[in-house]
Structure formats: structure tokens, C-alpha cells
Amino acid sequence: MACNSATGCQSGCYKNEFERDLKPATETISDSNEQNLCVKCKANEPTPGAGEDGKHCLDCFRSNLFGKFRLAVASNALITPADNVLVAFSGGPSSRVALQFVHELQQRAQKNFDASKDRSLPVFGVGVVFVDETAYYPVPSSEIDNAIQEIKLIVSNLSPPTKELHVIPIESIFCSNPCDGRERFKKLVDSVSDATGKEDLLLQLRMLSLQKFASENGYNRLLLGLCTSRIACHVITATVK
């Protein structure tokens, strides 16, 4: 029954009941809209897979990830102002994130250095290295050249401080002569019969190549862009051996 009384209804009409029915519906719509927004900024739509079951937007997820990276570096003194950091870069997503984050740390250090009057704390250096593994994975020279050019473009597009890119063949672990090194590398790899053993050997040679180059060129920190899946594989593999 409709009520048109301006002084308030004293009869048993359904006006209040109708208002009660509307209120929960409005709240439900509001709650649904909030659930479709980023839990941090409350402004953008969440991105699937961007942390905490996809509840963050891309910008907030990136900001949160960088904050954790910076906290881990600062809390454990992984990078100090006097360090020279070598980033192992493959071009994959993990190494790209590692390079970008350490670049942003270096940028912040550079801004603090420029703003300080005494300039007592130097800015840590950053270099980038790419390991050429064509001695193990034979690919056309044009493909590896294109890949190296793409990596050079990625590194050069980073804002200052400038970072030097180094390209080292994996066989350089044996000797400085490319021909002799490649021959010795092939001989060693061919001596391992199973595929898993060859992959393990390649991993060890890759790490030795990176460590050798870092020590010979003044780098005292080596940064690897390893994802959690790769680390988990290494742990499981080492456990069952």
C-alpha cells in the first residue's frame, strides 16, 4: 500500500519494508565494485597473476615487488656504495626484472649523491654480461647477432648512469683463444653421455665463466635473475642426487 503522508505514516504500509529491501542491494553492488578493484590503490582493476591471487593492479604489484627487492638488498647489505655489480642477463623476464630493479637502485643512489653536499658515499657501479652459449646450442650466426643487438638496445635505453655490456663465450672458461677454448669445451661436453649430466655441466661452466669474468674485470658482486621455479628445480635435483 502506498503512503503519501507528509507527517509520517501511522498505518501498516510497506514503505519502510521497501527501503529495507533496497539498502542491502545497494551495499551488495558497492561491495562487488570494491572486489573488482586493486586491494592497494582501490582505483585500478587487478591484473590476473599479479600477486596475492591477482588482487593487485600491475603498477601496485610492481611497486610492491620492488619494495621487497630494495628491502632485501638494504637489510642484508647485498649491495654497498663501494661495490661493482655484474648483472647476468639472458633477455628473459627474470633477468630483465633484476636489471631494471638494480638500475633503479643505482638511480636513487646517484640522486642522493648529487643532492649531498659532501658526496661522501660513492655510487655503486653496474655492468651487464651476456654468456654466448652457441658452442653448445648451435644456431645461425644471424640469430645470435640479432639477439645481441636486442640486448644492447635494452641496456642502452636505460637512463644514466651508463652500464657497459659484455658478451663472453662460454668456452672462454678454458682459455682466451676462441678456437682452442671451443675445441676443449666440445670435448668435455661430449664426454658426458646423458642429457641431464650435460645440462648440469653447462650450468657449472656458465657459473664459472661468470665468476671468472667478474673477478678479472673488477666486479665483486654477481646478480642472477633466477625465478623461484628454477631455484625449486635446482633444490629438488640436488636432493635426489
Feature roles, as predicted:
Residues 2-241:
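ATP-dependent adenylation/nucleotidyltransferase module used to activate substrates
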